[in-house]
Amino acid sequence: MCIRDRKYPELKEALEDLPIKVWAGSDAIAQVVQAKPIDMVLTAMVGYAGLKPTIAAIKAGKAIALANKETLVVAGELITALAAEYKVPILPVDSEHSAIFQCLNGAYDNPVEKLLLTASGGPFRQKTMEELALVKKEQALKHPNWHMGAKITIDSASMMNKGFEVIEAKWLFGVQPSQIEVVVHPQ
């Protein structure tokens, strides 16, 4: 069990008579993912927080189910090199990348020429550059299609998320950015 630092002493005391290990601190998740009975680790933390646990899991020989694109955005070269060194598969969980992965599964003798990623264009796709300069945070937080957390909503509205997905695809599928095309379509 992992817990925030401030509650650690209280929980540890409450569970001291039970066969439950309690971790706390910034290294807690990295310690947990190395546990013996675990064979696959789902990394679904937002942002840079997923990097350290992912590295620890790879070095412990655990398969990675990746739902944290930022890990590959900030350290794709390192993560893919470690995965190759430790013979650990990286399995994309995110919808588009998972679909591409499934399509490519078993197509070893058929090299990828191009990957297509789709984007709605966000709520501001019809705006001019001048209009975009006047957009307020509150407008960006009102996504027309779905409700998500603030960071992903801003990243989606600004198309930053799609940029992250291009970088993620580069590392997941071993292709060059020139082989990745983003098709913008409102639906």
Segments from the language model and where they lie:
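Substrate-binding/catalytic subdomain of NAD(P)-dependent oxidoreductase enzymes
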Residues: 153-187
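Rossmann-fold NAD(P)-binding glycine/threonine-rich loop
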Residues: 11, 48-60, 69-88
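Conserved anion/nucleotide-ligand pocket segment
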Residues: 97-161
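Internal alpha/beta domain cores that form substrate/cofactor-binding pockets in large enzymes
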Residues: 7-24, 36-39
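Short gly/pro/ser/thr-enriched loop/turn and capping motifs at secondary-structure boundaries
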Residues: 8-9, 29-30, 71-74, 97-99, ...
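Short, small-residue-biased leader/transition segments that mark boundaries at the very start
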Residues: 1-3
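General beta-strand structural signal in soluble alpha/beta enzymes
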Residues: 22-25, 42-43, 66-67, 90-94, ...
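Beta-loop-alpha module in the N-terminal Rossmann-like domain of NAD(P)-dependent dehydrogenases
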Residues: 24-56
